[in-house]
Curated annotation (Swiss-Prot):
Pathway: Protein modification; lipoprotein biosynthesis (diacylglyceryl transfer). It is found in: Cell inner membrane. This is Phosphatidylglycerol--prolipoprotein diacylglyceryl transferase. It is a multi-pass membrane protein. PANTHER family: PHOSPHATIDYLGLYCEROL--PROLIPOPROTEIN DIACYLGLYCERYL TRANSFERASE (PTHR30589:SF0), PROLIPOPROTEIN DIACYLGLYCERYL TRANSFERASE (PTHR30589). NCBIfam families: lgt. A 1,2-diacyl-sn-glycero-3-phospho-(1'-sn-glycerol) binds at R142. The keyword Transferase applies. Its main location: membrane. It is an enzyme of class 2 (transferase). The chain crosses the membrane at residues 17-37, 59-79, 94-114, 129-149, 204-224, 230-250, 265-285. Belongs to the Lgt family. One of its GO terms (biological process) is lipoprotein biosynthetic process.
Length: 300
């Protein structure tokens, strides 16, 4: 078993200014977007569509606005609507935390639709272009979660070699022991808690960093290197992220104020299901549309 090292959330101090690790992760995500975006503009089928570095800069600006506004509103509406409707001014306290990926995703979609309209492009053409770079941002975000010691995983077996104890989760650990008293004794978890005053948990932030971040980036980047029908790369992103996130949620601790919902699924899983279905539908539509186009050309 491992113990979370409890990193200082502040990476460095510049006079009165505190630079936090999580902020640096956002910066890393933006830099990787520009770096891999420029590599993508050099791919022949992408260059043929006229993408330039200027487009990347503009899309990053709109994307940042979409992530921040959508992520915050998504958290407010999906996770704690009762609280924020009763305390509306707290919506603006973003420094206290509270961002939702699914909300940020919708925010980016809206931002890219506006950008596409301004540039006279199809919004699917825009989302197909940016989709392969998005997992880089996901990886950076999950690494930031791990450094902050937040969004930890569910209680795991003490025999799991990479299980990790999170000092910040001690309150949730006690709640788990109260509701699983018999299981805690038979599994040896009570003995672990008696010794360390913490319970071993899945380091789900690392699972998500490796899954929906690193592995998903590699797979989607390789898929998008070749010309694909319009909408296919966007559909592959929705399907892939939805599957990775749905699977990771089985190891991630549900939000304390929500718990598990219908069918013992978490909010993250319920929000991922539509992404999976829409992703499949987009892939089917995309390839059928491309196939029909080839048939029409053959009969012309």
């Amino acid at each position: 078993m491992l113990i979370h090292p409890q990193f200082d959330p502040v990476a460095l101090h510049l006079g009165p200014l505190a630079i936090r690790w999580y902020g640096l992760m956002y910066l890393a995500a933006f830099i990787m977007f520009l770096w891999f975006g420029r590599l993508r503009t050099r791919q022949p089928h992408i260059a043929a569509e006229g993408w330039t570095g200027r487009d990347l800069d503009d899309m990053l600006f709109y994307g940042v606005l979409g992530v921040i506004l959508g992520g915050r509103l998504g958290y407010v509406l999906f996770y704690k609507p009762d609280w924020y409707f009763a305390h509306p001014l707290d919506i603006f306290k973003v420094w206290e935390g509270g961002m939702a990926f699914h909300g940020g995703f919708l925010g980016v979609v809206v931002a890219m639709m506006l950008y596409a309209r301004m540039r006279g492009r199809s919004w699917m053409q825009v989302t197909d272009f940016i989709a392969p770079m998005v997992p880089c941002g996901l990886a950076a975000g999950r690494l930031g979660n791990f450094i902050n010691g937040e969004l930890w995983g569910r209680v795991s077996s003490p025999n799991l070699p990479w299980s990790m104890m999170f000092p910040q989760a001690q309150g949730e650990d006690r709640e788990w022991l109260l509701s699983h008293a018999q299981e805690a004794v038979t599994s040896g978890l009570q003995a672990v808690f008696d010794q360390y005053h913490m319970l071993p948990r899945h380091p789900s932030q690392i699972y998500q960093f490796l899954g929906e971040g690193v592995l998903f980036f590699i797979l989607l980047w390789l898929y998008a290197r070749k010309p694909r029908p319009m909408g296919a790369v966007s559909g592959a992103f929705l399907l892939g992220y939805g599957v990775f996130r749905f699977a990771a949620e089985f190891a991630r601790e549900p939000d304390n104020f929500l718990g598990l919902l219908a069918a013992n699924l978490s909010m993250g899983q319920w929000l991922s299901l539509p992404m999976i279905l829409i992703g499949i539908a987009m892939l089917v539509w995309s390839y059928r549309r491309a196939g029909n186009g080839e048939k029409n050309q053959a009969h012309a």
